[in-house]
Amino acid sequence: MSPITLRIVIFLVLLAHGIGHSMAFFPAWGISSTENWHHRSWLLTPLIGDKASRVINTILFLAAFLGFIGSAIGLMGWLVPHDLWRPLAIPSAVISLVALFLFWNSFVAFFPNKIGAIAVNLAVLVCLLYLNWPTETDIGY
């Protein structure tokens, strides 16, 4: 695979993963909500209440959304310095995992998507922290 092709594939994965986090905004912001798609946390809502849970939902999912979008465009060197794509992707993956854990029951209808999101988060962490992949040469920098 050529470096530009690999860079585009990683860009699309990070971008799609980031956009996927926007699904949490709809119920948290009152745009759409059902019994199987809401902003309540199985752990936090009983402890701190509905409003605080909504705020934490928004903060976590918005941080992951912005972090992955920033990482994707940084990877390409658009608007965000290229050197920041890794430092944005790593905490975004951790934040996403925390958000998915805390709000696991919030998106019952999206169960396969949650499994995919966990897989992408773990892939980001393993590739960037453990394997140190991709190298700058691998992605054409």
Model-derived regions, located:
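Membrane-interface extramembranous regions
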Residues: 2-141
